[in-house]
Amino acid sequence: MSPSRFAEITSRYPQLRIAVVGDFCLDRYLEIDPARAEVSIETGLPVHNVTRVRSQPGAAGTIVNNLVALGVGEIVPVGFCGEDGEGWELRRALRGLRGVTLEHFIQTTERSTFTYTKPLIVECDAIPRELNRLDIKNWTPTPAPLRARLADHVRALATAVDAIVVMDQVSIDETGVVTAPVLAMLGEIAAENPGLPILADSRRGLRDFPAVTFKMNANELATLTGAVSADPAAAAAGLARERMKPVIVTLAERGVLGALPSGETVSVPVLPVRGEIDVVGAGDAVTANAAAALAVGASLGEALVIANAAASIVIHQLGTTGTASVAEIGRILN
């Protein structure tokens, strides 16, 4: 991609309005100094002393973080949090992000705030080491009135945004934001607005999703299509033809692959790796960057070149779920 074409695409990002529909969580990092370790007088067990606490939006919030880093003009989260301390922290973190508006983000006593608490051993000149994670999640189905409210919020944004990103993060069916009513509404919107980019990613798989652009990894592609082969391009092309929507597949060390309903495929090789890496957040960087580029009219191939470069930046950011700015991506590509 030429520098002028990259500039042409990314210069339009400030005019975009993108909705992010899905499971927002609080990523809370507890930085532990091992030099301050103690032993509990009461129990005799080791005590980890936390010297710093930092939080940021995670899951669907990671998509938001990436869109903010790209300079997207307005980002509209559609989701929920609880009436709890974690929910207060999550809303504060989202409000503090440039361009994020919360009129479609619901706070409710009927749900707990989805939370990842990540203890990190932090030593001077060493890579942070994560201990066992502590999660807070919802184990019961999302109440029907809340599901209906969320679907209504999605409907309200259908003709008011330039793209929709759907992030289904929860592992238990119907306990999060992306429930049957929301999926049905997304299907209606996709049918009524064929030119609107709608990108979807799901931890539980995309089998029950309507005809929108699918983003997945190679294992998820194999599970969905039943095509366990060394040629993911053929499987992706078949899926794109069947669904009549583009398909995006991340291939780890092999880069990223895209397929169009015509059967045409594009493959973008991975960029060189420099030192230690952490792949957490790389897939979300691909999703966010592809959505922004497609929303301003980039081709699928152009969108994936940008998205692949963003992922190559994010994997080098250790001890956090990283992002990539337009300037950083431009330096990688040029």
For the regions a protein language model found, what residue spans apply to each?
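Conserved phosphate-binding/catalytic loop of the ribokinase/pfkB sugar-kinase fold
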Residues: F105-A158
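A glycine-rich helix N-cap at a beta->alpha junction
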Residues: A93-E110
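Glycine-rich phosphate/adenosyl-contacting loop at the front of the ribokinase-like
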Residues: M1-I75, P269-I277
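Conserved post-catalytic alpha-helical subdomain immediately downstream of the catalytic base
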Residues: E242, L271-I332
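Active-site metal-binding loops of divalent metal-dependent hydrolases
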Residues: F24, Q169, A285
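Short acidic, glycine-rich surface-loop motifs adjacent to enzyme active sites
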Residues: A160-T175
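A glycine-rich beta-to-alpha transition motif near the start of alpha/beta enzyme domains, typified by
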Residues: C81-R98
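Conserved phosphate/ATP/ADP-binding segment of small-molecule kinases
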Residues: S171-T265, P269
